[in-house]
Structures are given as structure tokens and as C-alpha cells.
Amino acid sequence: MQPRTPLTLCVLLSQVLLVTSADDLECTPGFQRKVLHIHQPAEFIEDQPVLNLTFNDCKGNEKLHYEVSSPHFKVNSDGTLVALRNITAVGRTLFVHARTPHAEDMAELVIVGGKDIQGSLQDIFKFARTSPVPRQKRSIVVSPILIPENQRQPFPRDVGKVVDSDRPEGSKFRLTGKGVDQDPKGTFRINENTGSVSVTRTLDRETIATYQLYVETTDASGKTLEGPVPLEVIVIDQNDNRPIFREGPYIGHVMEGSPTGTTVMRMTAFDADDPATDNALLRYNIRQQTPDKPSPNMFYIDPEKGDIVTVVSPALLDRETLENPKYELIIEAQDMAGLDVGLTGTATATIVIDDKNDHSPKFTKKEFQATVEEGAVGVIVNLTVEDKDDPTTGAWRAAYTIINGNPGQSFEIHTNPQTNEGMLSVVKPLDYEISAFHTLLIKVENEDPLVPDVSYGPSSTATVHITVLDVNEGPVFYPDPMMVTKQENISVGSVLLTVNATDPDSLQHQTIRYSIYKDPAGWLSINPINGTVDTTAVLDRESPFVHNSVYTALFLAIDSGNPPATGTGTLLITLEDINDNAPVIYPTVAEVCDDARNLSVVILGASDKDLHPNTDPFKFEIHKQTVPDKVWKISKINNTHALVSLLQNLNKANYNLPIMVTDSGKPPMTNITDLRVQVCSCKNSKVDCNGAGALHLSLSLLLLFSLLSLLSGL
């Protein structure tokens, strides 16, 4: 294989489009010159020819169409390259794509003296024309294939060719990779004999921007002879995607009175086209402003950044003078750097003029009047204010303060959150007899502080005159409750105390009468004129109406007003205990086995309704007048309990044992209670008392039998 010159290699690497049949040597479709040079002028002038390009598809150039990599240039039908506007910098390289139904090709225009700029299509090529290409020991020569997206029928369409100068006779080309035998399968194919590469369908750069294919040569059996060699297919972007605003809704806020040039918000659109080209180079503008007052141009948008800023004087951003403190802007984003040929997308930006506290609240009048009955509490008057600020903010919400006339803290004022009114309330009942008139000084402020150049004036204070109305108040007992201590069982008719009630309405000189309101046991009476309370029955500390030795009664004091007013007083009578209750024993029934080894019968307890010292220690005894000493025994356990036991076993029967118990009062109280003892048959852990009733014996008979037994023993 002979070494190739650099020029030959450069030509092969730049070959990217259709090459006609090798038999057709008279006409080669494509540009006659693949690389052209242009000296960078001071400025490219609009509509001034730059150079002429020659393209021939060998079929008459029917429906010839040109595309230029820069939106600032175009190629006329005669092949003349012209600028669309005056421009100074276009980069180092331009690419011109020519296409007819029969052929297409790409020409490179090198700008001598040009500088790199963002967006040059040179970046999409994976090989550098200014760098030497490393020499490789292979005969397969491939160049990147450039295919514009969105091509139309007919398909398949030849897009490039692979050259193998040393390919053995009978060998074939084979193409593999993504888009051939990998998804999306069948997009590309190669003529196994000629090496022509074709595309079978429309490509979409936004779906797949590049395809990495591999070329190799095989023999007739499919065995690889050379390769695989990478073949890159680059999809050239077309401006087929509109800018889209994807982050809405767009809502911005700006404070009223903000200086000119205040940034409100940023609008950002997205374009799916190639960001390295002008197809995705966006420019922003405001298409419409609603409302259009006080100026149709309240805002400006930076065409490149999308920042929306204010452009009017601070005085025009006065929320209180605007018909509507909310503006809606239709924002348009246009690609192709804003040229008329660019695609557009729109979105709505809502801008709210926020309120600041530049208006102080003012009372609607300087003086307010209110009346309230003495003794009443609650709201007595609503104080109204005006404030021009936004009702949804702390710049409008009012805060009221009583700054004078409330030494006893009888009044409070709160803000009604719905109306912003000040609700003045009485929280401690007023007394007409003490003061019939009150004057309060009220101050109103906002929750938020005022701006520095605004202050609270005289209109931010108001005077409230309050008139207290006299009402007939009920008499008041003093003291309340009234307390007295008496011994229970005092004689009927005893005087307990004299109650006293006074009328708060001292200026009315009313008389007071007394009556009983509640006397649960019916023990008391009261003199209606002088309030003397005496007993009508015996007081009993042990009564169910007495709780913790205290008896409670209620009395009424009624004045002579029209209508009369009533006051209630409570009498608490503490009853001292006397020994008027005898103790009682428990239990009163017991069982014992007739053959019991343990002769204990029962443990007795005693209780007494009285209090110490009229209760325990109790004294337990067997009433000896009716019971023999040698049968029963009672023993003291403690102050409240005793043990009853047998001295010998008894026959199965029921026995009544009289128990006498005495308390410790002075004088003491005694009670005798029969203890019923059942002597039962106990066999095999079973207790049988059923037959005991049939042998019921009184203790007197038991005594008789005991005496006979003693006599017979003599």
C-alpha cells in the first residue's frame, strides 16, 4: 500500500455526500470546491456578495436548496453567499449544505482571521482539519457523515460512501452498530459492493444526535478481512422546535414605590434544538401588558437573560392609585437570536405590586359614645378606622391600645379581624355608685411598622365617653358564707345567729327582707325583718343532711326595688358531737363445727355513729344473766374487735348469744345484740347446717340442761 499524501487524506476526510457511479467520470455531483477561504473583513455588509459557490448534481440542479450554518447568511439560487445583516464576527468556519432530489454535499468556508464564537458548527465535527491525521495501517477510509434532520421522501437516500483502495476482489462491506443491527434497527444500510451508505427514514436530532457505526470488509463467507472502523453519523440540526416555558406559573412580586430598574423576576424558556446553534439561541420580549395603565410600558425584559425589570418612576408604582395592583405580561421567546425567521413560544407572567405601609390608620371620628349597665361585661362599642393599605397585610391590620383612663383595668380593646374595627369591652363590672362616667383615650397603629417618611398623626387617636347606667342590684350578705358552731341536740328555739345583708344601691335607700331559700332538714327559721335565725327542730349531727359535721342552709335577702332584686347568702353550721348513739356489733350470725378442734366462733367488730371520744375503745361482754360461763367466752382483740369462742363442743343446733357492747362516752352508751351461732355437722370437708334449725335451743334451755347435768353428776 503506497503512502498517501496529507492532501489526499484531507480530501477523503471531507468527502461526506453522494458520489456517483465510478463509471461516470465526466460529472461528479457536489460542490466543485469543498473548502473555500474568506478573509475576515471589518464587517460583512447586508446583501453584499461574499463569494460564489458552485454545486452540480449532474441532473440539472432541479429544486436546489441551500442551508448555511449561520443564520446571518444565506445562499441565493445563483450560488452567491450574502449577509442578511451587517455583522462583524461569525467565527472561524461556515458550512453550506446544498441539496437536490438527486444529490447533496457540504462545503466548508474558512474565515481567515476569524475568531471562535459560541454556536459555530465546527464544534459538531469530531475531527480537526487543522491537526494532522495519524497514519493508520488500514485501507478502509471513512469520513463523518452529516445528515440534516427532517429529510423527506424519497428513501432510501444515499448520504456517504466508504472507500477501500486495497479491498480484495469479491470482498464485501458490512455495516453494524446503533441504527443498523441495534435499535433503531434498519435506519442505515450499506451497499456491500460499492460502499455507499444510505439512510432509510427521517432522522430527528432531538431524539438521537449522533450514531456510532462500524464498517468492516468481509470475504464471501462473512469472515472479517479488515476493521471494524468507526463511522460517525452526525445529525445536523434544523430549527424545528419552538421555545417552551416549562416552569410556570410565573408569578413575580415587586414592592410599590420600587426604584426604576428593580428586577422583578426571570423568565426562562427551553428550546430542544442544538444549543450550539442559533436554532436554540433565544431572545425575549414583552408582547402585551394588561392593564396598560398608567403606562403601557411598565416593565422591560432583558432580551438575552429574560430578567423583567421596572422601567417607570417609583411614583407610578403606587398601589393605592392603581386600578389593579396586578399586571399580566405576555412574554415571547424567539429562537434564531430573535430573527423574524425564528420560532416563538409564549407564556404569561403575573406581576403583583406588593403593598408597603405608607398609610397610617385613621379613626373615622374623633369621639365615640358608649353606655353600659353597671355589673355588665362584654363589648360596648366598635371603633372604626380607615386605612388605604392592602387589607390582606399587616400594613392594614390595626392594633388598638388604651393609653389613658383605665387605671383599674376594667376595659380591654381587641381588633375584629374581619372589619379591622376596635372592639372595646368591659372586663371588670362597673359600679354606678362609684363612678357613673368614664373617659378613655384610644390609640391605633398597624401591625407592621410605617415606612420612614410616614408617621402617626392626631387622627390615630380617639376619645371614648362611657356612661354607666344604674341598675337595681341585689343585696349582698356579709360575710358570705356565714359560719356558726353549735352542739347537736340543742333545744328547739335556740338562736343560731343574725344574718346581715346590705344594698349596693346606697342612693336608693331600699329596705331588705329575709327568707329561707334552702333548709334541707327543715331545722331553721328566720325573722324576715331583722334576720335572726333560730332552730325549729333538734339538730342531729348524724343526719343524712349533714356532711362532715357541717349543715348547709341558704337565705335570701330581697330589696324593695321595682322590680325587687335578690341576694343569696350561705350559712354553714358546724355541729359538735354528743354521745347520743350506742355502738352496734357486726356480724350477727356465725357458724362453727360440732366437732371443731379450734373452738373459735367469730371475730366481732363494733361501730358507732358518734365521734371520738364517744366511740372506741369498746367494751365487749356476754350478757351473763342468761348465759352460763362454762360454755362461751369473749376475749378483747383491740379497741374495736373481740373474739367469741366455745369452751366445749356443742351439739348441732342454732344458739342465740346476747352480746353487750359499751362505748367510751361520758356517760357511756350500751347496746345488747343477739349473736346467732349455728353449730353444724362438718364431715369430709363438707359443712351441713340444714338440721340445725330443727334443734333450735334458746340459751335459757341450754342453761337448764347444763344445771341438770351438774346435778346428775352429784
Curated annotation (Swiss-Prot):
Chief location: membrane
Signal peptide feature range: 1-22
Propeptide segment residues: 23-138, 694-714
Top-level taxonomic group: Eukaryota
SUPFAM superfamilies: Cadherin-like
GO terms for cellular component: caveola; external side of plasma membrane; extracellular space; GABA-ergic synapse; neuron projection; perinuclear region of cytoplasm; plasma membrane
Gene Ontology biological-process annotations: calcium-dependent cell-cell adhesion via plasma membrane cell adhesion molecules; cellular response to toxic substance; cellular response to xenobiotic stimulus; endothelial cell migration; homophilic cell adhesion via plasma membrane adhesion molecules; keratinocyte proliferation; lamellipodium assembly; localization within membrane
Gene3D superfamilies: Cadherins
GO molecular function: adiponectin binding; cadherin binding; calcium ion binding; identical protein binding; low-density lipoprotein particle binding
Basic and acidic residues composition-biased segments: 158-172
Function: Cadherins are calcium-dependent cell adhesion proteins. They preferentially interact with themselves in a homophilic manner in connecting cells; cadherins may thus contribute to the sorting of heterogeneous cell types. May act as a negative regulator of neural cell growth.
Protein name: Cadherin-13
Organism listed in the record: Mus musculus (Mouse)
Source lineage: Eukaryota, Metazoa, Chordata, Craniata, Vertebrata
Recorded name of the encoding gene: Cdh13
